[in-house]
Amino acid sequence: MEEQKFHSLVKALNEHEGIEEVFLLNKDGSIIYKSGEFSLTDDEAKSILSAWKEKEPSLSFQNFRFAILKNDDLQLAAKNIGKGKGNIVGSITREGDYLIAHTRDEALILLEWSIFINKVAWS
């Protein structure tokens, strides 16, 4: 995916309040683009994608655990339970990359975020 398209997807995601960070990973879990300066290492990105692909029960982001509630080949939906650290949602893109966002518990509920990121990723 070209950088300009990534930034247009980030803009579309920001239609709703609650988007914290957005990042794009390739099929190996390497970071292609990030929506801003935030802490995300290549190892952490690879771990998130591995949890998604391997259908693990949880993933870690910024040292917080997120329980994976929806996990299929196209979409990911995970929630931080008890610590108030929001959600991780993701969708595969037309190009085969993985668009992932960290959201707050505002505007949309977790499954709505999951559907929304999928809609944006395929636009």
Swiss-Prot record:
UniProt key word Lipid metabolism: no
InterPro entries: PFN_sf (IPR036140)
GO cellular component: cytoplasm; cytoskeleton
Sequence intervals crossing the membrane: none
Localization terms from the record: Cytoplasm, Cytoskeleton
GO MF annotations in UniProt: actin binding
Record key words, sorted: Actin-binding, Cytoplasm, Cytoskeleton
Family, per entry: Belongs to the Asgard profilin family.
Function comment: Binds to actin and affects the structure of the cytoskeleton. At high concentrations inhibits spontaneous rabbit actin nucleation. This strongly suggests this archaea has a profilin-regulated actin system, and actin-type genes can be identified in this organism.
Miscellaneous notes: It is not clear if Loki profilins 1, 2 and 3 are from the same strain.
Protein name: Loki profilin-3
UniProt source species: Lokiarchaeum sp. (strain GC14_75)
